[in-house]
């Protein structure tokens, strides 16, 4: 007897897309939302964090079966950077900036150990643990986002073009501004 099983193509899931968006948005948008709610900034930071965090969907769309690995690698980097920024905000009440990086690289080991002894607290540890727990929870909810083959490339390119390439092209070639 000859068996002719037809393997069903995986279907697109709005729920899977929603979890992927929430996961990638979490790392940059949480701090921006806190800054907005506290009244220190407008909505531009939230808008930019939502838009540019969506770029992390490109590898997820191109390689849907590897979403957990891709999200874990990207997530660890985003988690470390965003946790540092969140802790800085909790300690100083302002956003992390380039001038902070300059000061950090000019710091010697004595100053660094003094800083850690002054600002390392239970509050920071609890915030870091809660932040990490939410990130892990969101990661466990991730499922492959299947977009049919020709469209996954179109959608990925549209994201890249709309968020990166078009603004660069407009500023460089039309407005004649430096990048």
Model-derived regions: residue spans:
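Transmembrane and membrane-interface helices of multi-pass
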Residues: 2-178
């Amino acid at each position: 007897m000859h068996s002719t099983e037809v393997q069903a193509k995986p279907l697109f899931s709005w729920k899977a897309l929603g979890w992927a968006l929430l996961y990638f948005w979490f790392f940059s948008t949480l701090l921006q939302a806190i800054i907005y709610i506290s009244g220190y900034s407008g909505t531009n930071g939230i808008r930019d964090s939502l838009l540019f965090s969506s770029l992390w969907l490109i590898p997820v769309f191109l390689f849907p079966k590897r979403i957990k690995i891709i999200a874990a690698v990207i997530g660890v980097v985003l988690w470390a950077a965003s946790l540092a920024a969140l802790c800085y905000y909790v300690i100083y009440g302002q956003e992390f900036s380039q001038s902070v990086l300059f000061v950090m690289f000019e710091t010697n080991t004595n100053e660094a150990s003094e800083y850690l002894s002054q600002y390392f607290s239970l509050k920071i540890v609890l915030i870091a643990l809660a932040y990490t727990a939410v990130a892990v929870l969101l990661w466990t909810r991730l499922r492959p986002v299947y977009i049919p083959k020709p469209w996954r490339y179109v959608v990925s390119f549209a994201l890249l073009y709309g968020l990166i390439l078009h603004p660069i092209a407009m500023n460089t070639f039309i407005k004649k501004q430096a990048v």
